[in-house]
C-alpha cells in the first residue's frame, strides 16, 4: 500500500506539473480598450502593442532609437567652482543651503530627451462590429500574438510577430471563406510627419521632437507592404486598401538615421527598405518558423513548473484579479517567464538597452521620458539576465557602459576636476551624464559605478576572461573617478562621497522644503566599496599594475563601515536619523544585501538582522518596481513566505491586465525585478556557496526547474516535493570546487562535508568592516535555519546528481 500511494502521488504530481508546460500564454476574450491591455511584441529593435480590435486593429509602433533631440551635453562647468563651498556647507550640517547651491551651479536646462512613439498602424475592417467567439492571445513560448473571431459565420484570424530573424513586423490576416477579406491600412502619427505611397508600400516619415532647446534631428521611416492571396491591393494618398482577398501578409519595416550617440548620419529609408526587401523573399510560414527558432534558442533554456490547480482556462485579466483568493502557481510561473520574454523582446545583442518601458511607449513625452534611470531602474532591468540564462541579453547594457564611460569622462573633468568617468542618476539615447531633475534627485554620482556591477557579475557567471579584459577600462575609469572624488570627512575621518544623496530620499522625507544632499550615504559607501573591490580583483586576475592595486586597497581601507542605529536598523545615512515609520519606496541602504553581496546571514548576522528590521520598518506596500526589489530582498532574507506575501501585493493593484508592472504608471523594471526575485527564491549563489531552495514559500510545495544559472559557470536543474529538495542536477562548465548549501542533508557522488573557506574564485567575496553599533540598543541576531554545506570537486563539462538523504 505504501508503494501504491507513493506511485499515485508521483503520477498526480506529474500531471499537475505538466499542466503548466504548454500554458505559457496570455489570453483574453475581448479586445484591448487601454494600452495596458494591449499585448507587447518585440525583436529588441521594433516594438508593437497589439490591441486586437475587430472593427479597427491598432498596432502601436516603436523603434528603439527614435528619441527626441540630437547629440548634446549637459555638463555645467560652474560646478567645479562651487564644489568646495557645497562641501563646506554639507560638513557644517547646512544641507538645504548646499542643495540650493547645487541647484544653482550643477544643473543645466537639459534634463534628458524622451523616447517617442512612431504612432500607430490602423487597420479598418468592413462590417466587423458584431463579432462573436472572440479570442486574443500572446504565446510567450513562440513570441507570437494572435486574434480570432467570427462575423456572419466567417472566421477571421490574425497572427503577428516582431521578427528576430528578419528585423520587421510580419502580420498574417486570413479568413475561412475565399474573397471575404477587405480592409484599409492607415497611419495615426502624433508627430510632425508625412504619409504617401512609395514603391507599392504605404510610407510614413516622422520627425522626432525638439526638446529643452535641443533640436530633433532623428527621422523614422516606416514602410508597409501587403502581399495578397486573391483579391486586390490598391492605394490612395494615405491608405493601403485590400479588397476581397483570401489572405494577406503585411510586412512592416521601420528604421531611423541613428548610428550611435554621436552620429546621426544614417539613411533611415535605405535601412527600412533593406530590411523589407530581404523579408519579403520568404513566405509567411518560413518567416514564422525562423523567428520562433531564433527566439526559442534563448527562451527555451529555462523551464519552471510549480504544482497547483490549473486555471489556464480562465482569461489572464481574471486570473490576476483572483490571484490572492487562491493558489494560482501557474500565473506566478507565467509572470516569471513573461519577464524573460520581455527581456528577450527588448534587449538583444547589437541594440539599445531596455529603457524604463522596455521598447514600448505610446507617448511623445512618456512618464519620466521613458529614459534610463540609473539609481535602480535600469539595473533592475538586467537583474534576471544572468541567473535566468539570458546572458546575451545583457550585451546592450555593456555596450552602453562603454559609451557612457566615454561621455562621462568630460563630465568628471568639467564638473569635478576628476579623472575617470561619472554618471549621475539618469541618461538617455545621447548618453548624457550630467545632473538632471534637481539636486534632490539628481545629485547622485554613483550611477556608473552601480552599472559596473553588471560587468563583474557577468564575469562571475560566465568566467569569460576576454570579456573582463575588454571592459576592464570601463571599471577602472569608474574606480578612478572615486579615487579622486572621495573626500575625508572632517568629523568621522572616513573617505566619503560629497555631495551626494540616498536616492530620491532625505532624512526629512521627499518634499520641496527638505534636503537630500549630504555626504557618505550608506548606499554610496556600499557601491564605492564594490567598484573598488571589483576593480582590484579584476586587476589581479588580469595581471595589471600592482601599485594601482595597492592604491585601491588603501582607499578601500578608508571607507566608512555600515552602521546599526538606535532602532536596530541599518542606518541609511552617516548620522542616526532614520525614522521607523518611513515608508519610502527606495530602500537604498539595502543595496549591500541585494543586489550586492556584502551582507551575509552567516558572516554578518547582526547586520543581516538590521537589514531585516529596516525592511519591516519600510513595510510591504510599495510602487511596482519597489515591490520587485523587496521580493529579492526577502528572498535573500531566506523568508520565502514573506517574499510570497510581496508577490501577492504585486498582483493586488500593481499588475496591469497585460501583466505589465504598474508603478503606476507602467515601468518595466518591476517585471524584471519579479523574475529575478523568483529565481532568487529558488537558487542563490552570492554568499560563497550555491544555496538550493533558500526561500521556498509554503504555496510552492512541489515543482521543478531546469536551466537556472549560478556563479562559477554552473547550470542548475532541481525538483522539490513537500517543500524540500528531492534532487538536483548540476552541470559544471568551467570545473572547480562547488560548495552547496541546503536546509536538508544531501547525498551524491563526490559530495563531501564542507570545511574551511571555499577557494573557488567565483565565490570569494570581499570582506567588509565590522559594523558600528549604536550604544542605545541591545544587539539583535537572526534566527536562522540549520544548514548543511558540502563541497563537490567538479570537472568542466561534467554533470552531477544530488539527492536528499
Language model region names:
Residues 22-440, 455-459, 512, 533, ...:
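Aromatic-residue-lined binding/catalytic grooves and analogous aromatic/hydrophobic interfacial grooves
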Residues 326, 368-372, 385, 435-446, ...:
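Alpha-helix capping and helix-loop boundary segments enriched in small/acidic/polar residues
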Residues 457-458, 462, 466-467, 478-488, ...:
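Non-catalytic carbohydrate-binding regions of carbohydrate-active enzymes
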Residues 477, 481-538:
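Acidic/histidine-rich catalytic neighborhood
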Residues 12-20:
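Hydrophobic h-region of N-terminal signal peptides that target proteins for export
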Residues 1-9:
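Bacterial N-terminal signal peptides that target proteins for export
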Residues 376-386, 445-456, 523-533, 588-597, ...:
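Well-ordered alpha-helical segments within folded domains of soluble proteins
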Residues 331-335, 341-344, 450-487:
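Conserved catalytic-core segments centered on acid/base and nucleophilic motifs
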